[in-house]
Amino acid sequence: EISRSDWSSDVCSSDLTKLLDIKDPNIQFIDIINRDTHKEIIAKLDYNAPSCPECGSQMKKYDFQKPSKIPYLETTGMPTRILLKKRRFKCYHCSKMMVAETSIVKKNHQIPRIINQKIAQKLIEKTSMTDIAHQLAISTSTVIRKLNDFRFKPDFSYLPEIMSWDEYAFTKGKMSFIAQNFDNLNIITVLEGRTQAIIRNHFLRYDRAVRCQVKIITMDMFSPYYDLAKQLFPNAKIVLDRFHIVQHMSRAMSRMRVQIMNQFHRKSHEYKATKRYWKLIQQDSRKLSDKRFYRPTFRMHLTNKEILDKLLSYSEDLKHHYNVYQLLLFHFQNKEADKFFGLIEDNIKLVHPLFQTIFKTFLKDKEKIVNALQLPYSNAKLEATNNLIKLIKRNAFGFRNFENFKKRIFIALNIKKERTNFVLSRS
């Protein structure tokens, strides 16, 4: 079904020009057609014949080209396209033909500049390329071509004094490496793999003098990074992420609780209570609520502290490991490195092998953990960046091409902060 608008060309042509933000005075609007799925704006491009670019003679108006179908931004919530008839000119001296040109679209192009600008704007957001194409009524290939217009030029003459290292999943079973400037959150590099060879080859492209400027590197408890970081950045201190240190202790406590819980009969009260209230054992004891509620498992009103006392009364082993765990948390959160490691050394032979494993790891990485307690740096900012990367990946239902994925990361995370690092191709 097609409906045509009744309008005065003198008034509406001017209004439509303002509405569409078209500044070319040589475009004249003729009609608007409202179709079921979109709007079509009929227009023509015409102006006085120019001189011939070949011989310099005066050209003459010849005819109009077949209408170009130019996609445009939505109007009144409907996809819109302009059917633009362009004047052709002919030189009767050398037979040169030329088509009229307009500022709204490049020569020999069909996608207008305003749509290209909108694509670039949406690429900065976390929208998938398929959704961008659907929203702007263009092909996905057009969006990918615009993505490829962005060029990231790594600056091998500079590295920040403080940077963060981490990894993220690019495809199933394959981890990639990412490094970020701790202060301004700009991405330094994204590498397809996280092997020592890949990371070493990348950072060796920086001069040693540049690498010696790095003072701090924050990272997870991933041992292959330790020696590599010291080789590449001889002046850098390694700071382990505090969250992952606490996570190691928490997991050891959780596994210990499960082992003790499984010693009880599955239908016993002890088993059910230990399983149901597992969070109270994991929680920092200083944050336990003192509000009293009716607890169906115990058939009485109890506070969280009273429930915890009952759980710990079921097993001396559980009580001992819980007390060690809580003391470790206390010293760690108060940044008391000497007391933290003193407690580990005093108890390493008295605890379950589950705790012994993490205690040995902590003692081996003592210097890096002390740095984490003494210095105000962590991997929290990079973990937040990784969440944004996961969002980009999830919205796109995954990426097959690593370079496209890498560009989306740089565009989304760097371009708002430092546009000088990007060159938008004008070709």
Residue map of PLM features:
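Single conserved hydrophobic/aromatic residue that forms the stacking wall/gate
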Residues: E1-C12
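Short Cys/His-rich Zn2+-coordinating modules
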Residues: I27-E40, K66-T80
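Short metal-coordination and nucleic-acid-contact micro-motifs, chiefly zinc-binding Cys/His arrays
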Residues: L45-A49, L84-R87
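Acidic/histidine-rich catalytic cores and adjacent linkers
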Residues: A49, E54, K60, L147, ...
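Short, positively charged, Gly/Tyr-enriched micro-motifs
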Residues: G56, K69-M163, E167-K174, R211-V214, ...
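Short alpha-helix plus adjacent loop in nuclease-associated cores
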Residues: I245-R266
